[in-house]
Regions:
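Canonical positions in the second alpha-helix
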Residues: 53, 89-90, 123-124, 157-158, ...
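Register position in tetratricopeptide repeats
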Residues: 39-40, 73-76, 110-111, 144-145, ...
């Protein structure tokens, strides 16, 4: 997936004093080439030309942005250690950059370092109190850590900033589901599905879980079926369908779905734990 890095490269171009300077500068020529490689998702070559640009002008004032782009290119290659080091370096140069903090936080999420992601998102919310995405993730991590009051505060701020944002809808749905308010959660998930051009299997999965909790089995079946059409190898969906079949007292169908869940990566013990 091409991440939002081209725009930052263009920002660097705009800061050049003139087109003649850019044409004569190896630094900007390397950046030009890196941008072309990024558009083609040739991450290895993009990394090479960004490194050449940094070597050409190691003291250039734009390098914090360029180093951030280098980190993102490395992240796309799953070079997580190098990427993290370069986000750290870029932030040492521009510690109050919201973009850099969000990029590093996103990487921390990707490598499941939730505490570090939480701290970066918290820094962003202090720098920009209207940043919806960061407040959403800050609240979501708080919820996962059991900090219900923090999550409620974050998600309440989302309602204040933009009650119609998909982040707000998903935040409220997740909160209500966690609190056991399944009817309310279903309403928020339904709003979110209406907002999505193509409903994600993840949203359908979550709403199906809520339907199962209140034993609306036909509705749960519909969501599970639609989710499986989008993600047929998602093991947990077969666990949900096994649970549905258990509630319908269909042990043969339940066992079939347990076997499918095992096939796609969930152990039998884990499947039975979720079905109970």
């Amino acid at each position: 997936m091409i991440r939002k890095i081209t725009g930052l490269l263009l920002l660097i171009f705009a800061m050049a004093s003139s087109s003649m300077v850019r044409a004569q500068s190896a630094y900007y020529n390397y950046i030009d080439t890196a941008e072309m490689k990024i558009k083609k998702q040739n991450w290895l070559q993009a990394e090479r030309y960004i490194l050449m640009a940094l070597k050409a002008e190691p003291a250039n004032k734009n390098n914090s942005l360029l180093i951030s782009n280098l980190a993102t290119v490395q992240r796309n290659q799953k070079k997580y250690i190098e990427a993290l080091k370069n986000y750290d370096l870029a932030l040492a140069m521009t510690p109050k950059s919201v973009t850099l903090l969000k990029n590093r936080a996103s990487l921390y999420l990707e490598i499941d370092s939730l505490s570090h992601a939480y701290m970066d998102y918290e820094k962003v919310t202090l720098l920009d109190r209207e940043d919806i995405e960061s407040r959403y993730y800050h609240g979501l991590i708080a919820l996962r850590k059991g900090q219900i009051d923090v999550a409620k505060a974050d998600f309440g701020d989302l309602l204040r900033i933009n009650p119609y944002s998909p982040y707000t809808k998903e935040a409220q749905a997740t909160l209500q589901k966690t609190l056991g308010n399944y009817e309310e959660a279903i309403e928020y998930y339904s709003d979110l599905i209406k907002m999505q051009e193509t409903p994600s299997y993840h949203t359908l999965l979550n709403r199906a879980e809520c339907y199962l909790e209140i034993e609306k089995l036909n509705e749960a079946e519909t969501d599970i079926r639609h989710a499986l059409a989008k993600a047929p190898s998602e093991a947990y969906l077969y666990v949900l369908r096994a649970r549905l079949n258990k509630l319908r007292r269909l042990p043969g169908d339940m066992e079939r779905d347990i076997q499918l869940a095992i096939k796609y990566g969930i152990s039998r013990e884990m499947a039975l734990f979720f079905i109970k």
